[in-house]
Amino acid sequence: MSQAELSTCSAPQTQRIFQEAVRKGNTQELQSLLQNMTNCEFNVNSFGPEGQTALHQSVIDGNLELVKLLVKFGADIRLANRDGWSALHIAAFGGHQDIVLYLITKAKYAASGR
């Protein structure tokens, strides 16, 4: 997405571009997109048509780097998908131990108020 497109972004357009970048799983592309979308109306915790947030999709894909990036930009690890599963449930079920450990650490850190 070009700077010109980002400067005139609308919420639906921005969400669509964001969801597409998550599906691609390219961490560098998504980081650039998130940094450039700071002036847009944008919600990193929005639900896509499949009832998943970007964080849920990244966990399903087993992409720890993308999970970390999304959390850095405000993804809520406590949100449940349409089936009632949190990112931690999905990671455990999928056997993504690295993501499980990361999410537990983040949850403990958030619970301690730090």
From Swiss-Prot:
The keyword Repeat belongs to this UniProt entry's keyword annotation: yes
Induction of synthesis: By Notch signaling via a CBF1/Su(H)/Lag-1 (CSL)-dependent pathway.
Keyword tags: ANK repeat, Developmental protein, Repeat
Residue ranges of the TM segments: none
The ANK repeat ranges on this chain: 50-79, 83-112
Disulfide bonding pattern of the chain: none
Recorded phenotype for the gene knockout or disruption: Axial skeletal defects in newborn mice such as rib fusions, fused vertebral bodies and fused pedicles of the vertebrae; defects are influenced by the strain-specific genetic background. Embryos exhibit expansion and fusion of myotomes, dorsal root ganglia fusions and defects in projection of the spinal nerves. Embryos show increased level of Notch 1 intracellular domain (NICD) expression in presomitic mesoderm and somites. In contrast, fewer somites and vertebrae found in -/- are linked to a longer segmentation clock period.
GO terms classed as biological process: blood vessel endothelial cell proliferation involved in sprouting angiogenesis; branching involved in blood vessel morphogenesis; endothelial cell proliferation; negative regulation of Notch signaling pathway; negative regulation of T cell differentiation; negative regulation of transcription by RNA polymerase II; Notch signaling pathway; positive regulation of canonical Wnt signaling pathway
Source superkingdom: Eukaryota
SUPFAM superfamilies attached to this UniProt entry: Ankyrin repeat
Complexes and interactors: Interacts with LEF1.
PANTHER family (alphabetical): MYOSIN BINDING SUBUNIT, ISOFORM O, PROTEIN PHOSPHATASE 1 REGULATORY SUBUNIT 12
Family listed: Belongs to the NRARP family.
Protein name according to UniProt: Notch-regulated ankyrin repeat-containing protein
Organism name: Mus musculus
Source species taxonomy: Eukaryota, Metazoa, Chordata, Craniata, Vertebrata
